[in-house]
Structure formats: C-alpha cells, structure tokens
Amino acid sequence: MRITVLSGSDSPEREVSLVSGRAVQAALETLGHEVTMVDPGPDLPVRLLENPPDFVWIALHGDKGENGKLQGLLDWLGLPYNGSGVTASAIAMDKVVSKRLFVAEGIPTPAYRVAEAVPQVSECQAWLAALGSPVVVKPADGGSTVGVTIAREAGHLPEAVRLALQYSPQVLIEQYIPGQEITVALLDGLVLPAIEIVPQGRDFYDYEAKYAPGGSRHLIPPNLAADVLKASVDAAYRACRAVGSTGLVRADVRVDPEGRPWVLEVNTLPGMTATSLAPEAAQAAGIDFEQLIQRIIDRSLD
C-alpha cells in the first residue's frame, strides 16, 4: 500500500511530530508498505492531488494536524486517514469547547476561566478566589504542554497568560487538581490498560517529562484502588465518547487525594514516539507497535 506520512509542519510541536513520523515510517516499512514522508506546507493539497496515496498517516501535533481542518481537506480529496474526523478533532483540539461539552455531559472536569488578553492583577485575584491556588494556565488549542505554566500567585498570572497567548488566541485558566495523573487510551472503543504518569524531578508532566528519556515513570496498572481506577477509566471513556473520537485516542485524568477523577482533555492524535503513552498502553494489551499501526490502518479503511 502507498502511504503518505505527514509530519513536521510549523507547529510548536514540530520536533515531536518529526519523531512520531520517523517511528511510524519505520513501522510501515517493516510491514511492507511504500512510504512517502511529507513535511506539509501550503502546497499540500496540490501534492496530494498530483500523487494521491492509498492512505494518509497524520503524524502531526498541534493545531496544524489536530483541529479538523486537515481532516476536512482529506475528506474532500477522498483520502482515508488515521484518527478522528472533522468534528471530533475540532472539539478535542479546542480545550474551551471540550470543557463545555464535558460540563454539559456531566463529566467531572476542573473548574476554569478563559482569557483572550493579558489580565489585570485584580482580575487574576478574582480567578484565584474562584478557582483556588495554584491554577494551570495553558493555550486553549495547544498540546505537548507547550506554553503551560502553574501559577501560584495573582502577580504571576499576567506573565503566564502572556506566554500562553503566544501559542493560542484563547487561554484556559484551570483549577489545579493535586493527586495522581492517569491516562487512558482507547483503540476503536476498546479500553487499553490505564497508565499512571509519575514525573521525575518536576512538579507536573511538562514537555521534558513527556519526551526526554527518564523524564517520567509509567506505572501499569496505576497505583489506585480498584474502584477509583474503574471510576477514572469510566470518566475517560465517557469523555472520548462525548467528543466523538474514533481510532486511537487518549484521555488525560487527574485523580485527587479523595479518589475523585477529573478529566483534563482528550487527544485525538496521540504521540507515536518511543516514550509515547498510547503505544505503551497497546503494548501492555499485547499489541506491538507494528500491529498497532496496521490495525489503525485496517479499521480506518473499513
């Protein structure tokens, strides 16, 4: 099968995307597919029209590959691809929209506020009064923890919002949930083993903890009571279903000291690097990396 792998682009997550792309390329070639690597730019529609592949593997991260626009282009061109469709991709990529959906569906998620400009300190004080301290400040449509800050004082919030605004026109100011970080991956609706993420030498699961070797420890199964784990998995499953995701998808959950799960977000194009969580969850379920890649392709073509 002739497969085009899209990786790179000009996203802040470009380097992660390139690593994912190379990992997918190696797996596809091992499986016997003919692979063309494309670093997409403005000429992508023309390139795909002139040399249409049998399948497009999206290994992009960030808004360039996850906000539904690329999915819409591929649908228009009639080219099958991995991951969720236009609507689910757009909802999951926009953290404000997805948070509103979670609230409407009764899915537990941390309280939040939204900023579109650098706030005054008085506004920051009101946020902290409502949300507590600290808060997590993040771009509304970013990933890989790029532009994310934990702010503990009102005076720190303007700079945190200013940083996040470099990556998104909207910024989410979110209640910080202490406790454990859990991620749950689904493969075509099948719940894969949950993973607990324990950052090493860091306050939270930042970019280095995600992608640097040794940046975090992953525990399978998580160190949770059975009923708490079940509640966490159920919340993650409901979030993925609410978004309308398909294929391989991952939901991130915080579990507070009282054992209550809080859904943070849904990722419709999980990373596929050597340290990525979704492939690790698949491996724990007995599905190796090449099998995972082929299964995603086969299901996308059904």
From Swiss-Prot:
Residues 99-298 form the ATP-grasp domain. SUPFAM superfamilies: Glutathione synthetase ATP-binding domain-like (SSF56059), PreATP-grasp domain (SSF52440). ATP binds at residues 128-183. GO terms for cellular component: cytoplasm. Mg(2+) 2 binds at residues 265, 267. Mg(2+) 1 binds at residues 252, 265. Its cofactor is Mg(2+); Mn(2+). Cell wall formation. This is D-alanine--D-alanine ligase. It comes from Gloeobacter violaceus (strain ATCC 29082 / PCC 7421).
